[in-house]
Protein backbone atom coordinates (compact mmCIF):
# COMPACT_ATOMS: atom_id res chain seq x y z
CA UNK A 1 0.00 0.00 0.00
CA UNK A 2 1.47 3.34 -1.09
CA UNK A 3 1.16 6.78 0.43
CA UNK A 4 -0.37 9.56 -1.66
CA UNK A 5 1.88 12.25 -3.23
CA UNK A 6 2.67 15.65 -1.73
CA UNK A 7 -0.21 17.39 -3.53
CA UNK A 8 -2.38 16.11 -0.68
CA UNK A 9 -0.04 17.18 2.14
CA UNK A 10 -2.06 20.33 2.91
CA UNK A 11 -5.11 18.32 3.93
CA UNK A 12 -5.44 17.70 7.66
CA UNK A 13 -9.01 16.35 7.85
CA UNK A 14 -8.54 13.78 5.09
CA UNK A 15 -6.17 10.82 4.96
CA UNK A 16 -4.89 9.28 1.75
CA UNK A 17 -3.51 5.93 0.68
CA UNK A 18 -3.33 3.81 -2.46
CA UNK A 19 -4.70 0.32 -1.81
CA UNK A 20 -4.46 -0.69 -5.49
CA UNK A 21 -2.70 0.72 -8.58
CA UNK A 22 -4.65 3.71 -9.85
CA UNK A 23 -6.93 3.81 -6.79
CA UNK A 24 -6.75 6.67 -4.30
CA UNK A 25 -8.59 6.11 -1.03
CA UNK A 26 -9.74 9.25 0.78
CA UNK A 27 -10.61 8.62 4.43
CA UNK A 28 -12.34 11.19 6.62
CA UNK A 29 -10.23 12.08 9.65
CA UNK A 30 -12.51 14.38 11.60
CA UNK A 31 -11.57 15.24 15.19
CA UNK A 32 -15.26 15.50 16.06
CA UNK A 33 -17.63 12.82 17.30
CA UNK A 34 -19.07 10.45 14.65
CA UNK A 35 -17.03 12.09 11.91
CA UNK A 36 -18.90 15.39 12.01
CA UNK A 37 -17.37 18.09 9.79
CA UNK A 38 -15.74 21.11 11.34
CA UNK A 39 -15.16 24.21 9.21
CA UNK A 40 -11.79 22.99 7.96
CA UNK A 41 -13.08 19.58 6.95
CA UNK A 42 -16.01 21.15 5.10
CA UNK A 43 -13.55 23.26 3.14
CA UNK A 44 -11.32 20.27 2.39
CA UNK A 45 -14.11 18.05 1.07
CA UNK A 46 -15.10 20.90 -1.25
CA UNK A 47 -11.54 21.33 -2.59
CA UNK A 48 -10.28 17.76 -2.90
CA UNK A 49 -11.99 17.01 -6.22
CA UNK A 50 -9.92 19.51 -8.20
CA UNK A 51 -6.71 17.95 -6.84
CA UNK A 52 -7.92 14.44 -7.61
CA UNK A 53 -8.91 15.47 -11.11
CA UNK A 54 -5.45 16.94 -11.74
CA UNK A 55 -3.62 13.86 -10.41
CA UNK A 56 -2.70 11.74 -13.43
CA UNK A 57 -1.79 8.81 -11.20
CA UNK A 58 -5.40 8.45 -10.01
CA UNK A 59 -7.96 6.54 -12.05
CA UNK A 60 -10.61 5.97 -9.37
CA UNK A 61 -11.33 7.41 -5.91
CA UNK A 62 -12.75 5.66 -2.85
CA UNK A 63 -14.34 7.87 -0.20
CA UNK A 64 -14.82 6.29 3.21
CA UNK A 65 -15.14 7.06 6.90
CA UNK A 66 -12.66 6.57 9.70
CA UNK A 67 -14.27 4.59 12.50
CA UNK A 68 -17.87 3.70 13.26
CA UNK A 69 -19.51 6.42 11.13
CA UNK A 70 -19.12 7.75 7.60
CA UNK A 71 -19.89 11.35 8.60
CA UNK A 72 -22.51 12.84 10.89
CA UNK A 73 -22.67 16.03 8.80
CA UNK A 74 -21.85 19.60 9.67
CA UNK A 75 -20.68 20.89 13.05
CA UNK A 76 -23.72 22.75 14.38
CA UNK A 77 -21.61 24.95 16.65
CA UNK A 78 -19.98 26.34 13.52
CA UNK A 79 -23.27 26.47 11.64
CA UNK A 80 -24.71 28.60 14.44
CA UNK A 81 -21.93 31.12 13.76
CA UNK A 82 -22.87 30.95 10.08
CA UNK A 83 -26.35 32.19 11.01
CA UNK A 84 -24.96 35.48 12.31
CA UNK A 85 -21.98 36.10 10.03
CA UNK A 86 -22.52 37.02 6.37
CA UNK A 87 -18.94 36.24 5.34
CA UNK A 88 -19.06 32.78 6.94
CA UNK A 89 -22.45 32.19 5.33
CA UNK A 90 -21.17 32.99 1.86
CA UNK A 91 -18.06 30.88 2.41
CA UNK A 92 -20.14 27.90 3.51
CA UNK A 93 -22.52 28.31 0.57
CA UNK A 94 -19.63 28.47 -1.91
CA UNK A 95 -18.02 25.39 -0.37
CA UNK A 96 -21.32 23.51 -0.50
CA UNK A 97 -21.67 24.30 -4.18
CA UNK A 98 -18.06 23.35 -4.89
CA UNK A 99 -18.52 20.03 -3.10
CA UNK A 100 -21.55 19.05 -5.17
CA UNK A 101 -20.37 20.33 -8.54
CA UNK A 102 -16.82 19.14 -7.85
CA UNK A 103 -18.01 15.56 -7.46
CA UNK A 104 -20.25 15.80 -10.51
CA UNK A 105 -17.52 17.29 -12.71
CA UNK A 106 -14.57 15.24 -11.42
CA UNK A 107 -13.54 13.06 -14.36
CA UNK A 108 -12.44 10.21 -12.11
CA UNK A 109 -15.15 7.77 -10.94
CA UNK A 110 -15.88 8.02 -7.21
CA UNK A 111 -16.82 5.01 -5.08
CA UNK A 112 -18.44 5.77 -1.72
CA UNK A 113 -18.21 3.28 1.15
CA UNK A 114 -20.36 4.09 4.20
CA UNK A 115 -20.81 2.38 7.54
CA UNK A 116 -22.64 3.83 10.51
CA UNK A 117 -24.16 7.30 10.21
CA UNK A 118 -24.22 9.39 7.02
CA UNK A 119 -26.00 12.69 7.64
CA UNK A 120 -26.22 16.03 5.84
CA UNK A 121 -23.01 16.76 3.94
CA UNK A 122 -21.84 13.24 4.80
CA UNK A 123 -24.89 11.81 3.05
CA UNK A 124 -24.23 14.12 0.09
CA UNK A 125 -20.74 12.67 -0.31
CA UNK A 126 -22.16 9.15 -0.43
CA UNK A 127 -25.17 9.77 -2.67
CA UNK A 128 -23.16 11.84 -5.18
CA UNK A 129 -20.57 9.07 -5.54
CA UNK A 130 -20.78 7.29 -8.88
CA UNK A 131 -21.01 3.95 -7.06
CA UNK A 132 -22.42 4.14 -3.54
CA UNK A 133 -22.03 1.19 -1.16
CA UNK A 134 -23.28 1.10 2.42
CA UNK A 135 -23.87 -1.35 5.21
CA UNK A 136 -27.45 -2.57 5.51
CA UNK A 137 -27.73 -1.15 9.01
CA UNK A 138 -26.13 2.21 8.19
CA UNK A 139 -28.25 5.16 9.30
CA UNK A 140 -29.05 7.96 6.85
CA UNK A 141 -30.80 11.28 7.33
CA UNK A 142 -31.09 14.60 5.58
CA UNK A 143 -31.73 16.68 8.65
CA UNK A 144 -32.16 20.15 7.17
CA UNK A 145 -35.81 20.40 8.22
CA UNK A 146 -34.90 19.55 11.81
CA UNK A 147 -32.71 22.65 12.04
CA UNK A 148 -35.14 24.92 10.21
CA UNK A 149 -33.53 25.29 6.78
CA UNK A 150 -34.50 24.06 3.33
CA UNK A 151 -32.96 20.86 1.99
CA UNK A 152 -30.56 22.60 -0.30
CA UNK A 153 -27.05 21.15 -0.48
CA UNK A 154 -27.33 18.12 -2.77
CA UNK A 155 -30.76 16.56 -2.49
CA UNK A 156 -32.72 18.54 -5.07
CA UNK A 157 -30.16 17.87 -7.80
CA UNK A 158 -30.07 14.08 -7.41
CA UNK A 159 -32.67 12.52 -5.10
CA UNK A 160 -35.66 12.83 -7.47
CA UNK A 161 -33.57 11.24 -10.23
CA UNK A 162 -32.45 8.32 -8.05
CA UNK A 163 -35.45 7.49 -5.88
CA UNK A 164 -38.31 9.43 -7.48
CA UNK A 165 -40.10 12.59 -6.39
CA UNK A 166 -42.47 10.86 -3.94
CA UNK A 167 -39.68 9.33 -1.84
CA UNK A 168 -37.53 12.45 -2.16
CA UNK A 169 -40.30 14.67 -0.85
CA UNK A 170 -41.17 12.31 1.98
CA UNK A 171 -37.67 11.89 3.39
CA UNK A 172 -36.55 15.48 2.77
CA UNK A 173 -39.69 17.05 4.23
CA UNK A 174 -39.89 14.75 7.26
CA UNK A 175 -36.11 14.38 7.84
CA UNK A 176 -36.89 10.80 8.83
CA UNK A 177 -33.96 8.46 9.44
CA UNK A 178 -33.68 5.38 7.23
CA UNK A 179 -31.26 2.49 6.86
CA UNK A 180 -28.79 1.51 4.17
CA UNK A 181 -31.06 -1.40 3.28
CA UNK A 182 -33.99 0.99 2.78
CA UNK A 183 -31.76 3.32 0.74
CA UNK A 184 -30.89 0.46 -1.61
CA UNK A 185 -34.54 -0.57 -1.88
CA UNK A 186 -35.54 2.91 -3.06
CA UNK A 187 -32.49 3.22 -5.36
CA UNK A 188 -30.83 6.06 -3.47
CA UNK A 189 -27.59 4.04 -3.33
CA UNK A 190 -26.04 1.35 -5.52
CA UNK A 191 -25.97 -1.49 -2.99
CA UNK A 192 -26.27 -2.38 0.69
CA UNK A 193 -24.18 -5.18 2.19
CA UNK A 194 -23.27 -6.67 5.52
CA UNK A 195 -21.15 -4.22 7.49
CA UNK A 196 -17.98 -6.31 7.25
CA UNK A 197 -18.26 -6.53 3.44
CA UNK A 198 -18.50 -2.82 2.62
CA UNK A 199 -14.83 -1.82 2.44
CA UNK A 200 -13.78 -4.94 0.52
CA UNK A 201 -16.56 -4.46 -2.02
CA UNK A 202 -15.64 -0.81 -2.51
CA UNK A 203 -12.04 -1.79 -3.22
CA UNK A 204 -13.15 -4.58 -5.56
CA UNK A 205 -15.32 -2.18 -7.58
CA UNK A 206 -12.67 0.56 -7.62
CA UNK A 207 -9.97 -1.90 -8.73
CA UNK A 208 -12.19 -3.17 -11.53
CA UNK A 209 -12.89 0.37 -12.71
CA UNK A 210 -9.18 1.23 -12.54
CA UNK A 211 -8.50 -1.56 -15.05
CA UNK A 212 -11.16 -0.27 -17.46
CA UNK A 213 -10.56 1.75 -20.63
CA UNK A 214 -9.94 5.17 -19.03
CA UNK A 215 -11.37 7.40 -21.75
CA UNK A 216 -14.50 5.29 -22.16
CA UNK A 217 -15.01 5.20 -18.40
CA UNK A 218 -14.64 8.95 -17.94
CA UNK A 219 -16.80 9.76 -20.95
CA UNK A 220 -19.52 7.48 -19.61
CA UNK A 221 -19.50 9.33 -16.28
CA UNK A 222 -19.38 12.69 -18.05
CA UNK A 223 -22.39 12.00 -20.25
CA UNK A 224 -24.49 10.40 -17.51
CA UNK A 225 -23.83 13.39 -15.27
CA UNK A 226 -25.43 15.71 -17.83
CA UNK A 227 -28.66 14.59 -16.13
CA UNK A 228 -27.35 16.32 -13.01
CA UNK A 229 -25.89 19.34 -14.78
CA UNK A 230 -29.24 20.15 -16.37
CA UNK A 231 -30.68 20.29 -12.84
CA UNK A 232 -28.01 22.79 -11.73
CA UNK A 233 -30.46 25.76 -11.69
CA UNK A 234 -32.71 23.78 -9.33
CA UNK A 235 -29.71 23.10 -7.10
CA UNK A 236 -28.62 26.76 -7.11
CA UNK A 237 -32.12 27.88 -6.11
CA UNK A 238 -32.36 25.35 -3.28
CA UNK A 239 -28.89 26.21 -2.01
CA UNK A 240 -29.74 29.93 -1.95
CA UNK A 241 -32.98 29.26 -0.07
CA UNK A 242 -31.14 27.05 2.42
CA UNK A 243 -28.74 29.85 3.27
CA UNK A 244 -31.51 32.44 3.46
CA UNK A 245 -32.91 30.10 6.10
CA UNK A 246 -29.66 30.11 8.04
CA UNK A 247 -29.94 33.90 8.29
CA UNK A 248 -33.55 33.77 9.46
CA UNK A 249 -35.40 32.96 12.68
CA UNK A 250 -36.08 29.31 11.81
CA UNK A 251 -32.44 28.46 11.22
CA UNK A 252 -31.38 30.10 14.47
CA UNK A 253 -34.14 28.40 16.47
CA UNK A 254 -33.54 24.99 14.89
CA UNK A 255 -29.83 25.00 15.61
CA UNK A 256 -30.26 26.48 19.10
CA UNK A 257 -32.80 23.79 19.95
CA UNK A 258 -30.50 21.03 18.75
CA UNK A 259 -27.53 22.38 20.69
CA UNK A 260 -29.66 22.86 23.81
CA UNK A 261 -31.18 19.36 23.43
CA UNK A 262 -34.79 20.59 23.38
CA UNK A 263 -37.64 20.48 20.85
CA UNK A 264 -37.57 23.34 18.36
CA UNK A 265 -40.37 25.89 18.63
CA UNK A 266 -40.95 27.22 15.12
CA UNK A 267 -43.34 30.14 14.80
CA UNK A 268 -46.16 29.53 12.32
CA UNK A 269 -46.12 33.28 11.57
CA UNK A 270 -42.66 33.29 9.99
CA UNK A 271 -42.84 35.30 6.72
CA UNK A 272 -42.44 33.16 3.59
Functional labels for PLM-detected ranges:
Residues 1-66, 101:
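Conserved CoA-thioester-binding segment of acyl-CoA-metabolizing enzymes
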Residues 1-14, 256-272:
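Terminal low-complexity tails and localization/encapsulation signals of metabolic enzymes
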Residues 26, 30, 45, 63, ...:
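Terminal peptide-recognition signature
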Residues 41-44, 92-95, 198, 238:
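Hydrophobic alpha-helical membrane-association signature
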Residues 101-217, 243, 248-256, 262, ...:
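Crotonase-fold acyl-CoA enzyme core
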